[in-house]
Amino acid sequence: MVSREVVKGVFWVGALDFDRRIFDELIPLPEGTSYNAYLIRGSEKTALIDTVDPSKEEELTSNLITMDVNQIDYIVINHAEQDHSGTLPLLLEVYPNAVVVTNEKCREILNALLDIPHDRFKIIKDGDTLSLGDRTLEFFITPWTHWPETQLTYLREDQILFSCDLFGFHMATSDLFITDEAAAYQSAKRYYAEIMMPFRGSIRGYVEKVKRLPLSMIAPSHGPINRHPAFILDAYADWVSDSVKNEVVIPYVSMHGSTEMMVVHLTKALIARGITVKPFNLTRTDIGELAKALVDPATVVIGTPTVLFGPHPQVVYATYLANMLKPKIRFASVIGSYGWGGKAVETIAKMLDHVNVEVLEPVMVKGLPDEATLKGLDRLANDILKKHKELNIT
């Protein structure tokens, strides 16, 4: 892709990756992604905000060459992960006088990952500024969004926040700016769930800090630029809050139909009680969509058959991921079936040790669900409704 002007003197010089379909060998990328790097030309100095993934280094260098960028004074690295920093070693060769501007923790990780010499760094602290002449960069240290060394960079005169991974999302698009806020909301919510949700306690404070800034744009490291910052800031404020919604998410697997019959009955019972239900058959589920669904609900009910003596392996995987993502759910339960015994319920309950939930009485059946099983599911639906009413969310 060619470079594009964001505002006078500020340019997008990154790369689009329409074909990438997985990130960290874990996160599906149904819309591809972008690696956003930004060039800022001041009256005295030129700065580059982040680099791109090593697989796209030629696109970044080509953009800089096409723009006749003969000198870069500062390369600001907001985040040490290689999709942000991976082209840094090459750029330091091409621009031998460039100084890497970042915080001490990021310098430490960059040195470990990329072996960047100590003498190439200028270390900044929270609130420090850097003059480019007629433009000023201000830095905010924001650990655990989503690594411990993350920072944000604010261009004062143009009121642009280069927000690193915060407020962004994976999408490869030829549009420089967000054009469809409804679609952007869904992609950003998915990205938040996959990347940011485990750190919502820290992020809550950063959202409030950013809200106090005069902002014309938020320019993230992934996805198009946001010219209406209030849209994404309000969304984040909702996601990181402690409030939950009158929703139940049901991730499940059914090997011979028994667990699926239970899921269908429970789904109907919850809907009849005015509760929104989102079932996910894990054999066909995009794990990113499941993560997104976990942002809001008050309750999760896990459906599993028993494999040998424990839950189905795909249920184990989904439960492990949910535990790592630490959603703000308040209640959890387990439904499912077994042939001769096992400890599926106990195993799942132990796996949710990072999620502060009240475990509601499970419903397990030997073989096919019978009338007693269906009554147990109705009882579980009533228990969930009661708990939701206590939270005043019905």
Task: Give a label for each model feature.
Residues 49-51, 72-80, 100-103, 161-164, ...:
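Active-site neighborhood of phospho(di)ester-bond hydrolases with catalytic His/Asp-centered motifs
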Residues 4-8, 46, 102-220, 224-229:
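Metallo-beta-lactamase
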Residues 173, 183-218, 223-224, 265-278, ...:
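FMN-binding flavodoxin-like domain, especially the glycine-rich phosphate-binding loop
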